[in-house]
Amino acid sequence: MLARPHRLVRGSDYRTAVRRGRRYGGPRLIVSVLDTGETRPTRFGFIVSKQVGNAVVRNTVRRRLKDACARQLPLPEGIDIVIRALPASATAPFAELLADVERAVERGAV
């Protein structure tokens, strides 16, 4: 779904994007967008806490978000995007999650 170069994997990268990035909120997601200025592919990170649901629900939400982000590519280089799922994302249809991700990426990455 989302290739390795497009994933945030280090905790320090997550922290930097959340603390220094622009934040966009909605009823199902909070999205932090940071333009690092580096020449590398756009990277996505996901935070899905236990408040969202049990492990099955959290993994389903994470897979849906990864698919929604993969559909946004290609994006400008050097952008880190961290998506925090809120409890309402557990019951939201994929189309609503996709629309939320599109809206946040459009506002932050363009």
Locate each region found by the language model.
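Positively charged, solvent-exposed patches that mediate nucleic-acid binding
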Residues: 1-110
